[in-house]
From Swiss-Prot:
Similarity comment text for this entry: Belongs to the thiamine-phosphate synthase family.
E.C. number(s) listed in UniProt: 2.5.1.3
Residues that, per the record, bind 2-[(2R,5Z)-2-carboxy-4-methylthiazol-5(2H)-ylidene]ethyl phosphate: 141-143
Protein name from the UniProt record: Thiamine-phosphate synthase
């Protein structure tokens, strides 16, 4: 389990694939606390190679930023000993979180996808082995069809109250949502397109962090 994890600005990588390494580094330089390497569809070998590149670039840009692998516990386990990889984010159909913890060790960061109250309650059974949950979608999103109804701002307070671990909002989240989402009690914003398509990903990440922090100080 990670003692210090900054979830305020959490980049989930996506298209365009050729920009992933540069955008990840820029977001890290702007204060993104987490970068999740996700690039679907992608082969395991290509994901591994991409993760190594992202990890090196992020470490150079901001050593405090944590780098996670999407879904593939095996890739995370293979890379963690020698690269700047810190854990994994797993979905409902991926490896059981307890097994992931056994494989990755006590210091790894493990996140789990949720998005409904029953899923949050189920995730609480893993509160001793996961570090946070992702909850969404906030809005309908073209990057991932979860089959779940959008939560909107009104959907998060109940999930935050029910969860035994920090909650990260995801699903067409943008910088301008930071203050409103912070008010719901979430620990941070997971952003895909907003950062990936930003003209200045560093400035975008800085904006998310500052707006989220200012809202929590009110």
């Amino acid at each position: 389990m990670s003692a210090s994890l900054d979830l305020r600005c959490y980049l989930v990588t996506g298209a365009p694939h050729e920009k992933v390494v540069d955008v990840a580094a820029a977001a890290a330089a702007g204060g993104a606390g987490v970068v999740q390497v996700r690039s679907k569809p992608i082969s395991v070998r290509d994901l591994t190679a991409l993760a190594v590149e992202v990890a090196a670039a992020v470490q150079k840009a901001n050593p405090a930023t944590r780098v996670l692998i999407d879904d593939r516990v095996d890739v995370a386990a293979a890379l963690m000993p020698e690269h700047n990889i810190h854990g994994v984010h797993i979905g409902q159909d991926d490896l059981d979180p307890r097994l992931a913890r056994q494989l990755l060790g006590k210091d790894a960061i493990i996140g789990l996808t949720t998005g409904t109250l029953p899923l949050v309650q189920q995730a609480n059974e893993y509160a001793d082995v996961i570090d946070y949950i992702g909850a969404g979608p906030f809005r309908p999103t073209p990057t991932k069809d979860s089959g779940r109804e959008p939560l909107g701002l009104e959907g998060y307070p109940a999930l935050v109250e029910a969860s035994r671990v920090p909650v990260v909002a995801i699903g067409d989240v943008h910088a301008e949502d930071a203050a409103d989402l912070a008010a719901t009690g979430v620990a941070g914003l997971a952003i895909v397109r907003g950062i990936m398509q930003a003209e200045n990903p560093k400035a975008y990440a800085e904006s998310v962090v500052s707006q989220f922090s200012e809202a929590n100080e009110r």
